[in-house]
Curated annotation (Swiss-Prot):
Protein name, UniProt field: Insulin-like peptide 04
Disulfide cysteine pairs (residue numbers): 45-50, 46-80, 59-68
Family to which the UniProt record says this protein belongs: Belongs to the insulin family.
Keyword list, A-Z: Carbohydrate metabolism, Disulfide bond, Glucose metabolism, Hormone, Secreted, Signal
Propeptide: 23-37, 86-106
Compartments, as annotated in UniProt: Secreted
Classification via Pfam families: Insulin
Keyword presence, Secreted: yes
Amino acid sequence: MPRTFLVVLIYILAGFLCSTSALRKVNEASGIKTDGSGYTIVEECCTESCKLEEVNEYCHLFRGRFFCGEQILDIYNTVCNPRSIRRKRSLTVDKREAKKFIRQRR
């Protein structure tokens, strides 16, 4: 019985990994940029709603919601840079660091 459970679990995990890598390949083939952590980078959007123009080069579509401007800083701090949370640094970054982060995403 435990062996059957283990085999089923392995098949489920393998299916999940294959589906996520296949989705990533489909996105790359269709020109959709992804950063591997569930974000889809959508260029030239959120231009009117963004307050921080230096970070307003593109926004992220994450789990059906758009994030742009100052919200990119929140994404950077909470998801894209988890080491900053582990070091217990402040959850805000300056504009230079955010611009550097965006340049690296291209």
